[in-house]
Every structure is written in C-alpha cells, then in structure tokens.
C-alpha cells in the first residue's frame, strides 16, 4: 500500500473553495427553475417563443466556451471561475425582474455564458487541487454540484410556496450568491495554472 500523502492547509482550503463554487453553480441555476412558469405567464410568452428563449442558454454556453481557455491562460482558473460565477448568479436579478421578453432573454443568455466559463474554470482549478492531493477527488466536486442543484430547487420551491415575489427571491439570491462567489477567491490556489511554482503551492 502507498502511504497517503500529506495535504497542506492551502490545498485543503482550495478544496473547500472549489466545493463552494460547484455548490453555487448548481444552486443558482436550479433556484430559478420552479419560478419559470410564473415568469412565462407574467410576460405572456407562448410555448413556441418560450422554447426559443430557453434555447438561448446552450447558445450562451457555446459562445462563452470558445474563449474560456484563453481567459484561463491570461488570468488563471481561480480568477475566471470566481468572476464569471459572480456574473452568472448576478443575472438572477435580471431574470427575476425582467419586464419584457428581451430582458429575460438577455438574462438567460448571460447567465448561461457565465455558467459555462465558470464550469470549465472550476474544473480546471479542481484538477490543480487534485494534483496536490495526489489522489482522485474531482468526482466529489461534481457531487457537490448535485447537492447545490437540489438545494437551489428547494429554495425556489419554498419561495414559491411561501408567496415570495420572484423579483425579491432573485434579488436576495443574487446578492447572497455573489458574496459567496467572491469569498471563494481567498480559498483558491494563487498564481497562474501553467506556472510550475504556483502548481506546487501548498504552504
């Protein structure tokens, strides 16, 4: 048997930072889903146009995915993940307060674009942390995404059942999620991903 390698405090902190990003990523996206029928009804959007509007989400992700690698090389996976997670969750406020269909479309597109950038960057950072642990831990991060999605769905459902206005739910959720996303930065590994010294950071 091989001995379990020592894990530094910095690596442990970074693991919790990545966990927080994965949890937020799942929670933010799922929190608005229970309110979609109300939004659709409020804006008087028929089924055909609603389907096209929701299709903007994968389009936003596709467009954002084209530039993610370049952004990570320029700024680091930690910075890209945190900044675009904050941007993505902030779009909840735009979605929840949309008074016309184009505002909702913009919110859906931008949230999905930020989500795609975050998804790639937080996985890249998770791989950095995994290298410090010297054992597979990446799957556990995806487990936390699933937990976040369940929590977000429950949050949205509870707000709906409790009669909380959509705009208020989204405003509070966006504010709280942005603070949490920015707070994750202090936990993550410093330096650029391609910097050998940064990759070994663990003290």
Residue locations for each model-derived region?
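Symmetry-related core transmembrane helices of the 12-TM Major Facilitator Superfamily/SLC fold
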Residues: 167-186
């Amino acid at each position: 048997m091989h001995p379990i390698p020592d894990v530094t405090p910095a690596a442990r902190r970074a693991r919790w930072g990545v966990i927080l990003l994965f949890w937020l990523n799942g929670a933010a996206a799922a929190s608005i889903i229970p309110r979609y029928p109300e939004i659709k009804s409020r804006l008087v959007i028929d089924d055909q146009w609603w389907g096209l509007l929701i299709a903007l989400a994968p389009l936003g992700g596709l467009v954002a995915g084209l530039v993610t690698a370049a952004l990570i090389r320029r700024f680091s996976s930690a910075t890209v993940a945190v900044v675009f997670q904050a941007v993505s969750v902030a779009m909840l406020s735009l979605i929840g307060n949309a008074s016309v269909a184009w505002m909702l479309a913009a919110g859906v597109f931008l949230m999905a674009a930020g989500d795609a950038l975050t998804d790639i960057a937080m996985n890249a950072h998770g791989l950095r942390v995994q290298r410090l642990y010297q054992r597979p831990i990446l799957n556990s991060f995806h487990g936390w995404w699933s937990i976040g999605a369940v929590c977000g769905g429950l949050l949205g459902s509870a707000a709906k059942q409790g009669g909380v206005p959509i705009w208020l739910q989204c405003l509070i959720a966006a504010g709280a999620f942005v603070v949490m996303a920015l707070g994750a930065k202090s936990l993550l590994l410093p330096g650029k991903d391609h910097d050998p010294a940064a990759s070994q950071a663990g003290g």
